[in-house]
């Protein structure tokens, strides 16, 4: 009560709010997957928390008509997780449609044709690729009722910028599947190449070449990689195999699985 939603340092950066929301929801789903049960008072408070995150993200997007990067991509991914979790409403339908539309646009903008992130940093490439692959997997797993929101939303209810394109969101066949999704074939091609890029910038010692910025930022950190330094475990931030493992959850390529090894099968399964 002393620090309500929207107040304090933890709400200053929308990227942080978005990543926090996605991680809270990931943790919730992991608890549910192993049989955890939550009582009604908890769920009421939990849903209110997630709704507050969604409202904050939607009204504080880090968008710029020219200069936007991983912060805005995180905003989109976080809002997508929120919209996918919450029950359908006129508001959450617009959040879902907006997130999907912008995810497709930003993948085309922020990743080059060879799959590399434009920020010229393998570590930022990992961060942004994680946002894309987990957001993509989430959309591909949406139930029919949620998918219907992509054709039934009212774009006039979206009051933030950039604007929300009118319904419906166009749907395409998923390559190699009978499923349909809002992602065109070129989107999947670029996502697959994100993993290929990570493989190509990884040295024989299993660590990526340290080029450009590296603030160790992650979207999800499910199975961190550690090395022993002076007899103590230390996280190895230059081991990016988990990103390739996560992307391989969508493509099931033997080369990706061989590169990632057995340590990150959890990321693949998610």
For each feature predicted by the language model, list its residue ranges.
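Active-site lining segments of carbohydrate-active enzymes
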Residues: 3-137, 141-144, 156
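Carbohydrate-active enzyme catalytic cores, enriched for enzymes
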Residues: 123-270
